[in-house]
Amino acid sequence: CDLCGHELLYKYPLVLLYCIENYIFVFQIVGFMEFIKEAGVSPQKSMDIKNDKITIKPLRDKDVGIFSKWLAKEYIYKWFCPDGEEHKMAWLDEVNNRNTQYHYMKHFIVYYNDKAIGFCLYLDCYFEKEYIPEHYGKTVDEKETVFEIGYLIGEEEYLGKGIGKIIVKKLIGEIAEIGGKEILADPDEANVLSIRTLLSNGFVK
């Protein structure tokens, strides 16, 4: 998984299940409009948070280079590429084939005042017939109902500023717009910042 210890399954609202290996967060979009309203996000305007300073835009071919550069940074590489260079190449293959083989994944570049500072994505779990059952212990029988998310902040000076929380809110808003009902995420237990970010966005422990 993009964010990949001891496993806990989190559901919204306030349901806790114990599992085996990884922290696995599940956000169920039940009463989602109420949650979004409280969080200050409009699903119809999910890009308009924080005075329009933080935006997400679809990844383009010319963005692959900066994404590759971010993946090579140690603090990102250890989470996104736990299997080393093979894993990095798999990421690059994914974004390069995002309109064909990986059409069910939506990749974005995150901008702060028009400066590219990060990356995020969501994927429709319906199309992952092996990974989702093996990793989350569930099957998905309908398109556009269950999604997985991931994100990174590629520029160090933007770490620790609450931008990850904004990114997750935007992804939740995007998924809600297309009728998603459940969102999955799988941060490593050592990735404390990502865990806090998910919890602060309604993935409740």
Tell me what each language-model feature is:
Residues 158, 162-170:
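Conserved acetyl-CoA pyrophosphate-binding loop and the N-cap/start of the following alpha-helix
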Residues 75-96:
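Conserved GNAT-fold acetyl-CoA-binding loop/helix
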Residues 165-166, 189-205:
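Conserved active-site alpha-helix within GNAT-family acetyltransferase domains
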Residues 124-148, 159:
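Conserved acyl-donor/pantetheine-binding loop and adjacent beta-alpha core of acyl/acetyltransferases
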Residues 150-159, 188:
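A short, internal acetyl-CoA/4′-phosphopantetheine-binding micro-motif in the GNAT/acyltransferase core
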